[in-house]
A protein has these predicted regions:
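Non-heme di-metal
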Residues: 1-153
Length: 153
């Protein structure tokens, strides 16, 4: 990236951090903990699902997108290696935020018994095992993809 962008990128990153401080991404206050039941004691059954299938699909899709985080973070780090330090800082912050989103979505689905926990585990495992093979190769393509993925989820 052009070093002349660094002051503006630092400014944008600082603005992001200020906005992020006002949002508590700690999911402990958002989840219906009182609905939680031990799956060994009370096995999952399809009759326990209360969310519409479209909502479940949307949450699962967002979750599975976030699950690719280890691969995508590695890709971003390699793509921007040796770039501006603010980019590296942002990648680390973004990774932390995306991990929180993933944890929130998965925990919500399990607490509300909206999905078969074994099926969700297998889906998650399959996505991570599948890796991430981008078909783009430049920093601008990586930023474009990341922006679209962020807006979609």
């Amino acid at each position: 990236l052009d070093f002349r962008l660094e002051p503006r990128l630092k400014e944008l990153y600082e603005q992001h951090k200020i906005r992020a401080q006002k949002i508590d991404w700690g999911y402990h206050e958002f989840l219906p903990w009182d609905k939680g039941m031990d799956f060994k004691r009370v096995p999952w059954d399809e009759s326990q699902v209360t969310l519409p299938s479209g909502v479940i699909t949307a949450i699962e899709t967002a979750l599975l997108t976030e699950v690719n985080l280890p691969w995508f973070t590695t890709y971003l780090s390699a793509t921007f290696k040796g770039s501006l330090s603010v980019i590296t800082d942002f990648i680390h912050t973004w990774t932390s935020e995306e991990d929180q989103h993933s944890n929130l979505l998965e925990t919500y689905l399990l607490l509300t018994r909206s999905v078969n926990p074994k099926r969700l585990h297998e889906l998650r495992k399959s996505v991570v095992e599948g890796g991430f093979e981008p078909d783009f190769h430049t920093p601008i393509e990586a930023m474009t993809y990341t922006t679209l993925q962020e807006l979609a989820t």
